[in-house]
């Protein structure tokens, strides 16, 4: 009898190996925690709220969106890599270039760029330079003229340190020949009241901000190859003579070691959700992407190369 049971167990295990995903056919069976590493109100949060009902419909379980801001995402990412179980029930929002720049520049970042199992990169938002509507700076040239005449006096807020906003500010300084003072915030959400309250001169933020706050803010330039359809009257930096193109790719990741069938199931759910919410996202100034699997990894490497110069400059100044 014992021999029969052992043989049966071996046979079942063999079938599970031969038929990938058989052990995960029931995933998911309980609620999923979707952590956003920034404050509510920013692009990551807005997107997660649009995704949430579509994901729940697709997966058949609750998807609980939580927030853990701090360190431009580093607080949540480091905790996730330390503690999240690779079972698909803990997933987290990820941003490029944040996850590339922070571990390279900060010795204490607490996480590794390659320490995530990327499920999908689902959209991109180009950076924009914005000022308040009552600002004396009507154009990018106005802003640059002030910054040149008053080195370090112009304060530029943004989401996090060594984030897309921060790195774009550094690239802008170099391209325009100015010295600015960058003021990091825990996400896009807190940047807006700081700008409208007059606590900072301007903000290097994202296209969604230019669209959502067009009645309260003035967008001076957008860091895209072409004008953003949702901001048709805003010139690109390139149009104005500054070769600056960049922004944030956003996506979602699971812990390393998460079984591929689970990752594939989540990727399908996010892909389907992306298609459903795309119109709303496009209207807010987002550019939709659908990078999964090898394409997701290639995107990380492509952007690592794109930001190599500015990251190298930062490393030199820190030595």
Residue ranges and their predicted role:
Residues 279-300:
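Mature extracytoplasmic/periplasmic domains
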């Amino acid at each position: 009898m014992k021999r029969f049971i052992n043989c049966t167990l071996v046979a079942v295990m063999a079938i599970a190996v031969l038929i990938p995903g058989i052990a995960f056919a029931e995933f998911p069976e309980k609620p999923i925690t979707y952590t956003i590493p920034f404050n509510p109100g920013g692009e990551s949060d807005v997107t997660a709220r649009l995704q949430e009902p579509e994901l729940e419909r697709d997966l058949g379980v609750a998807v609980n969106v939580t927030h853990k801001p701090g360190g431009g995402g580093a607080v949540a990412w480091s905790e996730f890599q330390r503690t999240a179980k690779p079972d698909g029930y803990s997933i987290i929002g990820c941003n490029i270039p944040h996850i590339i720049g922070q571990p390279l520049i900060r010795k204490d970042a607490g996480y590794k760029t390659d320490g995530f199992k990327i499920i999908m990169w689902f959209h991109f938002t180009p950076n924009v330079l914005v000022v308040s509507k009552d600002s004396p700076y009507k154009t990018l040239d106005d802003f640059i003229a002030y910054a040149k005449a008053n080195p370090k006096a112009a304060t530029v807020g943004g989401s996090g340190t060594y984030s897309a906003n921060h790195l774009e500010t550094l690239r802008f300084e170099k391209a325009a020949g100015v010295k600015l003072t960058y003021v990091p915030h825990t996400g896009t959400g807190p940047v807006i009241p700081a700008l409208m309250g007059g606590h900072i001169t301007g903000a290097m933020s994202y296209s969604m901000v230019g669209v959502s706050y067009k009645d309260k803010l003035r967008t001076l330039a957008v860091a895209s190859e072409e004008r953003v359809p949702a901001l048709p009257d805003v010139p690109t930096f390139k149009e104005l003579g500054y070769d600056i193109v960049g922004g944030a790719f956003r996506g979602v990741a699971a812990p390393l070691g998460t079984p591929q069938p689970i990752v594939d199931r989540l990727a399908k759910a996010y892909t389907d959700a992306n298609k459903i919410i795309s119109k709303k996202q496009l209207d807010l100034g987002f550019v939709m992407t659908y990078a999964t699997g090898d394409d997701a990894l290639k995107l990380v490497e492509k952007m690592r190369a794109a930001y190599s110069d500015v990251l190298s400059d930062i490393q030199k100044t820190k030595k």
